[in-house]
Amino acid sequence: MTTKPILVALDYDNKNHALQLIDQLDPNMCRLKVGKEMFTLFGPQLVKDIHERGFDLFLDLKFHDIPNTVAKAVTAAAELGVWMTNVHASGGLAMMEAAKKALQPYGKEAPMLIAVTVLTSMSDEDLKLIGIDVPAFEHVQRLAKLTKQAELDGVVCSAQEASILKSLLGQDFKLITPGIRPVGSDVGDQHRVMTPPEALAAGADYLVIGRPITKATDPLAALQAIHQSLV
């Protein structure tokens, strides 16, 4: 099992509330994920606040732009010292290669760089509406292969896709899976979901888990229970 596979997704519009939650968690059991809303609201200072508390951070901004712009964006993320950041694979091979090249000067200190394939909220019908006339899983495989060709570290994918992607792309290619819900949790707006043990067994390396931990009466107890279920 990957060391610290749990990535706690933070989703707050109040920084103090976010830090109060973070202070209840254990950096030895999880890493944290910050997305577009929180980074737009609170900026790089939030990243520094998280690092000061001993947590690794996945800066989930899903960059998608021309290659030069994305290269500069991932460089900025590296300067912040984040553990992982990401781009949209649909930005294309040249964009992903430019992003990867931009991180070379950081050597072993470079953040992991992964790509988003198909958002877990997207159904086959949703894909058809944007001109992609193949099933979601087929499109995921196509984008994941392109990501590996660009020499990125892995992809975000649904847990249902993990087993085939591992066999297709190899054990060293990391799979980060949202849509993870412990037994009894509300599936929310995620269409493709699994429990944490199911996802790891399927080949996922990192599990993105938000509300089952952040909205729990006792967030640390919820984190500990999920962590224990994976041991």
Swiss-Prot record:
Query: Which catalytic residues are annotated?
Result: 62 (proton donor)
Keywords assigned by UniProt?
Decarboxylase, Lyase, Pyrimidine biosynthesis
Q: What is its EC number?
A: 4.1.1.23
The membrane-spanning stretches of this chain are: none
Specify whether Phosphoprotein is a keyword of the entry. Answer: no
According to its UniProt entry, one GO biological process term is: 'de novo' UMP biosynthetic process
Q: Which CDD domains match?
A: OMP_decarboxylase_like
Q: Which reaction does it catalyse?
A: orotidine 5'-phosphate + H(+) = UMP + CO2
Q: Which GO terms describe its molecular function?
A: orotidine-5'-phosphate decarboxylase activity
> NCBIfam families this protein is in?
PRK00230.1, pyrF
Q: Which HAMAP family match?
A: OMPdecase_type1_B
Question: What's the protein here called?
Answer: Orotidine 5'-phosphate decarboxylase
